[in-house]
Amino acid sequence: VYSCLDALTGAYIINKVPRFDIKTDRELETQEKYYVCDIAMRNAVMRDEGVGFEAQLENVLCNEMLQRGFKLYVGKQGQSQIDFMAVRGQDRTYLNCCETVLDKETVKKEFGPLTRIRDNYFKMVLSMDGETIVNKGGIINFPFISFLVGG
């Protein structure tokens, strides 16, 4: 399986994003995630698999951050996951993305892991909601589309 994944990565069909343990501040050697380089290909291949909209948003965000020159990791914070830890130079940005933050369960799922990170790097939740909201803990909810076109 890994040789096939390596071949697909080498052919620029998929991107490998390693997992990073935020608490211990180290890259993990297992449980990496893979994202397709072309979201249209992903949709064509998985059209009948019931792939969720949020998974598509995550894939688009991965491609965008790589295009902007960031090194990406999937963040691990205890039992929780951060969609991406984007690193460029000495700077880090923690990113979660979701369809909406208008229900309490999603707010808990998306903001909760970010509030438990005890460093001062930028933390953001990107959603399809139209407004920018700053959470009490300094975490910004920013419109996904606005982020893609200019953020």
What are these regions (language model features)?
Residues 82-83, 103-106, 131-135:
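Short active-site-adjacent structural elements
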Residues 90-103, 110:
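Active-site ExK catalytic segment of metal-dependent nucleases
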Residues 71, 122, 138-140:
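Conserved beta-strand segments of alpha/beta enzyme cores
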Residues 35, 93-95, 124-126, 140-142:
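Hydrophobic/aromatic beta-strand patches that form the interior of the parallel beta-sheet core
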Residues 74, 120-127:
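Short, hydrophobic beta-strand segments that form beta-sheet elements in well-ordered domains
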